[in-house]
């Protein structure tokens, strides 16, 4: 079992190289840290990623009349045998979301990931400044 803290910073810049830019910051109890960036494009009512780590998309689920569900698919760039489907559930007040990942290798379930998140702020510019980020 891998348990760690994460902070996701999702940006929608008015000007910049891409319309969506996500940075993930991970911290493990032993002090290990990791930072990954995921720039993305919008097209066909989806967010699309294509970078050195993943190729994939995220989209709202139109069958959900409550607009609580987003589905995501991605494949590891260097490993075509491994792909992932993620279901994201957003609370009605927009303050929480839970995510479930199914990692599939060669058509078989390899592992599951469960994530509980809490919304912090819409002011991603202030967070970027606080963290010293530049995109």
What kind of feature is each model-predicted range?
Residues 1-135:
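Soluble ligand-binding/transfer domains with enclosed cavities or grooves
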């Amino acid at each position: 079992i891998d348990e760690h803290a994460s902070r996701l910073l999702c940006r929608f810049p008015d000007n910049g190289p891409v319309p969506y830019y996500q940075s993930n910051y991970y911290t493990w109890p032993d002090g290990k840290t990791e930072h990954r960036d995921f720039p993305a494009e919008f097209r066909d009512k989806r967010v699309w990623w294509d970078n050195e780590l993943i190729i994939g998309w995220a989209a709202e689920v139109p069958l959900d009349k409550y607009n609580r569900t987003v589905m995501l698919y991605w494949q590891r760039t260097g490993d075509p045998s491994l792909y992932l489907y993620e279901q994201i559930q957003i609370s009605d007040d927009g303050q929480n979301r839970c995510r479930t990942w199914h990692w599939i290798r060669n058509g078989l379930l390899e592992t599951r990931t469960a994530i509980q998140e809490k919304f912090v702020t819409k002011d991603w510019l202030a967070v970027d400044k606080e963290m010293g980020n530049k995109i």
